[in-house]
Amino acid sequence: VKSQQIKYPTLTTTRTYGDKLYVLEVIRDLDEAIDLICQTMTPEEQLDPFAEDLCPYFGVLWPAAEALAQYLSDHAMLIKNKKVLEIGCGLGLPSLVASHLGGKVLATDFHPDVSEYFLRNCRHSSMECNYQRLNWREKNNSLGQFDVVIGSDILYESKHPREVAMGLMRFVSPGGTIILSDPGRSYLQQFLTAMNEEGISEEMSSIKISQQEILIFKFRI
């Protein structure tokens, strides 16, 4: 299954953190967008396990991304002058916030369409940010290590928890920090257990976004 570079209907929305207004182009309607991509696939392609990875979930501004952005804004000293990696960046709001706070940010995602939307949002918010396509499930790491690794709502599949734990560890430099936001996914505890088994404990807090409690986890490596 190949990405079709579909021109999904979009709209713009804004968020403000600190003194900075962020303008984001988002997919107008996720169900409509999924219907559009399904129309480009044969019935056989729709059954391909990889087809799910091409669904444009990246185009939604999820509460977990907003919560992570808010947390970073509230804890700017965790980011300032640090080398920062975001995995699964989607629209890129946390990366934009981290960049504005003085982080040297590399935003990454696996979906082939993310780069176009992320770079648009950089322009909309009058910012310059670096982006690279990355499948963090792969064991090879050509990116090197980072002071801070961030991610929002990345524990959405059963196969992810230990892979995420091991993947994150590969990207964090000794003495570095991992910051994740999660809406309470069912695989969260498995991930925390995997991190604990590596001798890494977490500090937990929460942020409410649109009446939804989002958990924030900070790990010191």
Language-model segment annotations:
Residues V1-I221:
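S-adenosylmethionine-dependent methyltransferases
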